From Swiss-Prot:
Homotetramer. Oligomerization is required for carbohydrate binding. Gene3D superfamilies: 2.60.120.200. SUPFAM superfamilies: Concanavalin A-like lectins/glucanases. Residues 9-141 form the Galectin domain. It is found in: Secreted, Extracellular space, Extracellular matrix; Secreted, Cell wall; Endomembrane system. The gene is Cgl1. Transmembrane segments: none annotated. This is Galectin-1.
Amino acid sequence: MLYHLFVNNQIKLQDDFKAEAVATIRSSVFNSKGGTTVFNFLSAGENILLHISIRPGENAIVFNSRTKGGAWGPEERVPYAGKFKGPNPSITVLDHGDRFQILFDNATAIYYTKRIKENAAAIAYSAENSLFSSPVTVDIHGLLPPLPPA
């Protein structure tokens, strides 16, 4: 399923994002002078299952989770520098059931262990001066079946 997600908005997913699903967020531009840009994967109860906060000013990409109205957990960080290489950056999230695998421009950055065991029902995108286009495209599908033996 393909969606268009505008900055400072969210999309409700037609089907839950759950184990064995892949979400790819693609931008038509990369604004290297952009500021903090955030993507949140939210449950139907508005818990933030996966928070991806791209912070160029801190040279960090922060991952976290929290229940609606609850406190943030401990941050997990990776360096920002060099994560987005092309003019059309992408973020891919694979749901492995017990953890998320997050890739930037098709390179794995982190495996983030799920802290809240729910499915995502929405994805939010926020920024004051986004690194990415508005809208971005969000493509959600299941994992491809294994290839037959050669």
